[in-house]
From Swiss-Prot:
The keyword Transmembrane helix applies. Belongs to the CidA/LrgA family. LrgA subfamily. HAMAP family: LrgA. This is Antiholin-like protein LrgA. Inhibits the expression or activity of extracellular murein hydrolases by interacting, possibly with LrgB, with the holin-like proteins CidA and/or CidB. The LrgAB and CidAB proteins may affect the proton motive force of the membrane. May be involved in programmed cell death (PCD), possibly triggering PCD in response to antibiotics and environmental stresses. The chain crosses the membrane at residues 13-30, 40-62, 69-91, 95-117. It holds the Pfam family LrgA. It is found in: Cell membrane. Signal peptide: none annotated. Keywords: Cell membrane, Cytolysis, Membrane, Transmembrane, Transmembrane helix. The keyword Transmembrane helix applies. It is a multi-pass membrane protein. GO terms for cellular component: plasma membrane.
Length: 145
């Protein structure tokens, strides 16, 4: 019984930082071997998701640090904003092209999101409809008995 309490207890903050740092370290190693360029942080997110889904990492082992990072996400975007300001010279060379790319990519993103949402809604409504149909058939069979 005591082991169950210890297993469900959230890990200490430092332990959680180490777990996330190890995931990021492994993702950086994977990034160096990948044939296509992909940011290590994206690989790390996918890796952490897989580890959480498989149970290799428990939610309590990363939850507090994850929540802290999410709560301070605005502060984490400051370096990205500064790098954009430093790149203004590059942006000023082709501003209409960049604005056009932003508009086109936003429209494509909205279209793809709409289609995926429609597909998911159709699939979930079918599965719900199948469950309702089965339940009605069972109730009818019980009523005839």
């Amino acid at each position: 019984m005591k082991q169950q309490k210890d297993a469900s207890k959230p890990a200490h903050f430092f332990h959680q930082v180490i777990v996330i740092a190890l995931v990021l370290f492994v993702s950086k190693i994977i990034e160096s071997f990948m044939p296509i360029p992909m940011p290590g942080s994206v690989i790390g997110l996918v890796l952490l998701f897989v580890l959480l889904c498989t149970g290799a990492v428990k939610l309590g082992e990363v939850e507090k640090v994850g929540t802290t990072l999410t709560n301070n996400i605005g502060l984490l975007f400051v370096p990205a904003g500064i790098s954009v300001v430093n790149s203004l010279g590059v942006i000023s060379q082709a501003p209409f092209l960049i604005i056009g790319l932003i508009i086109v990519s936003t429209i494509l993103l909205l279209i793809c999101t709409g289609y995926v949402t429609q597909i998911i809604m159709k699939v979930t409504s079918r599965s719900k409809g199948d469950k309702v149909t089965k339940k009605i058939k069972i109730e009818e069979a019980q009523a005839h008995d």
